[in-house]
């Protein structure tokens, strides 16, 4: 079986593939089907020979297509149907289980709790594992101050630090988003599936600054749903982030984000676990036991 985290991981007539992988010249419009064919061809050119050489060393037969090999007989989409509905895919059946959530109930650090309690809900910014420039902290602090908001920056893998040490901004390390997000005014992030889903469950507006892959899908979804907006990370400036913050802090978007949280809630991990047991029992030819 194969687990995917966004509908754009599977070829579809409804959704184009995420970048990189669209190899056509931008001046030539292509159908979604042709974009997927180009993507699959590019993937095979990059990886097929290397995979088959390794398989040959192990005495295994060669494969003909990377994606067909990766997508097993059972393909599960670990994403909420309200946030990321799976479109019809004529090539294969996909079971949408809902998001696989491991609750993070670690208490917030005392310093973070004290910061939250000192004023209005702040803006949270985190780019996870993305290799962002250290200079982005200047942009973040300036935009937050322009909108009159306090700021929490997550260090992330880029080890971000504050541009200055004003009392209106703090930096945090690894922290429970489950407990923090319901207490912030908005979440600015790169568009990772986990951060997107957690912010949606928390009912807070989002600003996604996508950099590659399925992050562009998630940025388009939160915009379509009216629970946030997007701004290109490559051209992120104080002005562009200020505009985005002003947009998502509008009462209409705040209300939509709050209401949308009630639509996100299926425990996809439990659904997947039940399906896994059913598949295992069917494969063994018996009903099995608890």
Annotate each PLM feature:
Residues 1-33, 82-83:
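Conserved nucleotide-sugar donor-interacting segment of glycosyltransferase catalytic cores
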Residues 3-5, 191, 208-212, 230-235:
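Short beta->alpha connector loops at strand-helix junctions that form conserved
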Residues 79-186:
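Donor-nucleotide binding loops and adjacent catalytic segments primarily
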Residues 239-290:
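C-terminal amphipathic helix plus adjacent low-complexity
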């Amino acid at each position: 079986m194969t687990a995917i985290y966004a509908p754009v991981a599977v070829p579809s007539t409804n959704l184009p593939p995420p970048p990189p992988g669209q190899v056509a010249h931008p001046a030539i419009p292509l159908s979604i089907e042709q974009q997927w064919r180009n993507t699959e061809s590019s993937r095979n050119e990059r990886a097929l020979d290397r995979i088959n050489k390794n398989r040959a060393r192990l005495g295994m037969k060669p494969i003909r297509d990377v994606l067909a090999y990766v997508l097993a007989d059972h393909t599960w989409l670990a994403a909420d149907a309200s946030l990321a509905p799976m479109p019809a895919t004529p090539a294969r059946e996909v079971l949408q289980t809902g998001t696989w959530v491991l609750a993070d109930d670690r208490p917030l650090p005392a310093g973070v709790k004290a910061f939250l309690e000192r004023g209005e809900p702040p803006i949270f910014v985190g780019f996870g594992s993305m290799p962002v420039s250290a200079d982005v902290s200047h942009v973040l602090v300036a935009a937050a101050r322009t909108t009159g908001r306090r700021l929490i920056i997550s260090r992330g893998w880029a080890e971000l630090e504050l541009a200055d040490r004003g009392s209106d901004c703090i930096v945090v390390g690894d922290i429970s988003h489950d407990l923090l997000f319901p207490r912030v005014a908005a979440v600015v992030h790169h568009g990772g599936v986990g951060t997107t889903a957690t912010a949606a469950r928390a009912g807070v507006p989002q600003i996604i600054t996508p950099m590659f892959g399925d992050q562009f899908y998630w940025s388009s979804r939160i915009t379509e749903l009216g629970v946030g907006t997007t701004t290109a990370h490559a051209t992120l400036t104080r002005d562009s982030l200020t505009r985005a913050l002003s947009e998502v802090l509008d009462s209409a978007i705040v209300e939509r984000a709050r209401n949308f949280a009630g639509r996100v809630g299926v425990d996809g991990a439990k659904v997947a676990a039940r399906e896994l047991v059913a598949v295992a029992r069917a494969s063994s030819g018996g009903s099995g036991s608890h």
